[in-house]
Amino acid sequence: MRSLSIFGATGSIGESTFDLVMRKGGPEAFRTVALTGGRNIRRLAEMARALKAELAVTAHEDCLPALREALAGTGTEVAGGAQAIAEAADRPADWTMSAIVGAAGLVPGMRALKHGRTLALANKESLVTAGQLLMRTAQENGATILPVDSEHSAVFQALAGEDTACVERVIITASGGPFRDWSLERIRACTVAEAQAHPNWSMGQRISIDSASMFNKALELIETREFFGFEPDRIEAVVHPQSIVHAMVGFCDGGLMAHLGPADMRHAIGFALNWPGRGEVPVARIDLAQIASLTFQKPDEERFPALRLARDVMAARGLSGAAFNAAKEIALDHFIAGRIGFLDMAAVVEETLAGVSTDPLFGKVPDALEEVLAMDHLARRAAEEAAGLRQQKR
């Protein structure tokens, strides 16, 4: 029986993964080694019961008594805290879903790779902050990383059986978010509620706002660089409002391979779960006649400066991605709290990158996770200062 673990089980990606696992037979088809979640103890316990999980972990130690009570008598072991999540990744599992949002997902993902696992990677911050270290760890331990972002899953599939030396360009698509047709002035004055209202995808608050600012796409550009190893000038993003084409790969013979799929994360998750084969996934089928037209346009980097900043990071490499991600997370915290404006987020990130770029770690290829965490900490402090100054100017 195949074994699996789901890190970030109660988030949107985790819920979709759980849904697919249950549809494929649940505990009759899979041995669930570990499930982790945050404060939604009730849902974590429901999942653990349904899958007969061996271990359930909450990221918050103060929630551990509630989790212990919810799973009393089930035989499921419980634990709490960041260290417990890291240790859960040391438990052998054939397939591990890494869906913890933010830099917190880096440690368990790295631990899973060190044990030679197949890692379904939905945590984009891992590649952004420590891409070179992550890919090297996978190679050294015979582990496999499967991208779960819809765009990178699309590129992965388009490249199957191809000679990457013949690839001229990789194009990932962006819906453009709720602000794709807004003026710069209107975007500057937007509210949190407006920013989190995504037109195509059903996602959590933070990733929806990242989509509105196109920081999500900026992270994905960096991911593409780190995962597939293509040079920055061969990677681009286009706005595609219909969210049907997820990525395209252009080849040296002039051919352009496009991957089309529904705007449903279960499509990419299902591919990773069924890999190296394919299996049925319960998503809507595309009716091209009904869609009638697909449109594409260049993104406006004045309204969405995150894309420009991503190109700087792709060129610098080293630990610049860790600084970029840390600053983005801090800036997003301040925007959600109402302390800075929407466009201030990019300004905070740009000022943070400038401030930490003189540190020796900034351009260094990391040798260990500790260096990644050190840059993350340094950039978070710098971003807090930059956000504080922005708040004072409002």
Swiss-Prot record:
General function of this protein: Catalyzes the NADPH-dependent rearrangement and reduction of 1-deoxy-D-xylulose-5-phosphate (DXP) to 2-C-methyl-D-erythritol 4-phosphate (MEP).
A GO MF label: 1-deoxy-D-xylulose-5-phosphate reductoisomerase activity
Keyword NADP: yes
UniProt record, GO biological process: isopentenyl diphosphate biosynthetic process, methylerythritol 4-phosphate pathway involved in terpenoid biosynthetic process
Name under which the protein is recorded: 1-deoxy-D-xylulose 5-phosphate reductoisomerase
Cofactor(s), names only, from the UniProt record: Mg(2+); Mn(2+)
Gene3D superfamilies: 1.10.1740.10, NAD(P)-binding Rossmann-like Domain
InterPro entries reported for this sequence: DXP_reductoisomerase, DXP_reductoisomerase_C, DXP_reductoisomerase_N, DXPR_C, DXPR_C_sf, NAD(P)-bd_dom_sf
Catalytic class of the enzyme: oxidoreductase
EC number(s) reported in the record: 1.1.1.267
Binding site for 1-deoxy-D-xylulose 5-phosphate: 124, 150-151, 175, 198, 211, 216-217, 220
Matching SUPFAM superfamilies: 1-deoxy-D-xylulose-5-phosphate reductoisomerase, C-terminal domain, Glyceraldehyde-3-phosphate dehydrogenase-like, C-terminal domain, NAD(P)-binding Rossmann-fold domains
Source organism per UniProt: Cereibacter sphaeroides (strain KD131 / KCTC 12085) (Rhodobacter sphaeroides)
Metabolic or biological pathway, per its Swiss-Prot or TrEMBL entry: Isoprenoid biosynthesis; isopentenyl diphosphate biosynthesis via DXP pathway; isopentenyl diphosphate from 1-deoxy-D-xylulose 5-phosphate: step 1/6
Catalytic activity: 2-C-methyl-D-erythritol 4-phosphate + NADP(+) = 1-deoxy-D-xylulose 5-phosphate + NADPH + H(+)
Record keywords, A-Z: Isoprene biosynthesis, Manganese, Metal-binding, NADP, Oxidoreductase
NCBIfam families membership: Dxr (TIGR00243)
Binding-site residues, NADPH: 10-13, 38-40, 123, 125, 204
Positions with a binding annotation for Mn(2+): 149, 151, 220
